[in-house]
Amino acid sequence: MSENQIIINNLSKVYNNGFEALKTISLDIKKGEIFAMLGPNGAGTTTLISIICGIVKPSSGSVTIDGFDIIDDYRETRSRIGLVPQELTLEQFETVYNNVSYSRGLYGKKPNPPHIEKILKQLSLWDKKDQRLRQLSGGMKRRVLIAKALSHEPSILFLDEPTAGVDVELRQDMWKIVEELRKTGVTIILTTHYIEEAEAIADRVGVINQGEIIVVEETKELLKKMGHKKLTVELQYEISKIPDSLDKYKLVLGKNKMSIDYTYNVQAEQTGITNLLQDIKDAGLKLKDLKTEQNTLEKIFVSLVKENNEI
């Protein structure tokens, strides 16, 4: 999975009113990976996707897909991309099957009923193929959007906020669908405001803010590099203050005054936990239980955006 399928080089976009939506972005996306783009509203993620998909023209820079330029080889690159928009853009009075098969014709592809049947079955839509869209739930309509985007057999799938407005159960269901699609060799790029979504399914994460890429990193590595763990030491009884002998650990007394929190770097050679527990014992405190909590991608994201805004 080392081959770069999408190569973005010094891409920028400035609108007529002077607004700079993208500031010389460079990014490579690997073939067969799930790449999550995170960013606050107005960060530039939608503009970036729109340029790659040929909807918006860049002001400068280049994008190639499998070696083809998105402007010089527009038809070639567009046929390799499937786009699932956030809005439910579907013909409500048409059947599921007709919605999906019609999309294939828009790319100049000949009818291929076996392929349409395959993706409808893959997305658990085959038994609903003759139903009209207006009869389906929101979650099923979103599946139809994915089926439409896959109808012309693209090798890249863009998902713009794929689980926006759906409940937790449907969201997790959608994650499973994305994982299954990846197994077929499709490269998946998703934008999301649900940071746990990126944490759960993405191989790599790119954080975009104010038109710039702040960081691109493997999800696990980002969590490892910037993640901290919190150790909560639960006590057998209340204490009014943390003993002075424990000052060096920068502990925080819990709200119930029956626990103390210790934050440490997971990358450090020595976390200091062993010494801390011994010093707690020496201070005469009685331990009841220990709990650890890993820093989340959400906390890291907020931290990165805050740092970028302060520059």
Please annotate each region the language model reported.
Residues 61-72, 77:
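Conserved ABC transporter NBD signature motif
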